[in-house]
Design a protein with these regions (language model features):
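Intrinsically disordered, low-complexity, mixed-charge
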Residues: 1-80
């Protein structure tokens, strides 16, 4: 399976609700590498790399997020 790297901006109520920690836990569960951080504009930025099917699974998960999050937008691009 090919490895891919994805970069996302997640908007909505995604800060102060455990979004970063939950994203790290989901990425670990999917055996992905990467990082996640809060941005000053209220969004969360995520970069991750791994097998394509697992990377796409995290992309789908970001659209829902953890229980207390309210995701309103996810912008994803594939990195070279």
């Amino acid at each position: 399976m090919a490895r891919i790297c994805l970069h996302a901006y997640v908007g909505g109520r995604v800060q102060g609700v455990g979004f970063r920690q939950a994203t790290r836990e989901e990425a670990d569960r999917l055996e992905l590498d990467g990082w996640v951080r809060n941005l000053d504009d209220g969004r969360v930025e995520v970069v991750w790399e791994g097998e394509e099917d697992r990377a796409k699974a995290l992309e789908r998960w970001l659209g829902r997020g953890p229980r207390h999050a309210e995701v309103s937008a996810v912008e994803v691009e594939q990195m070279p």
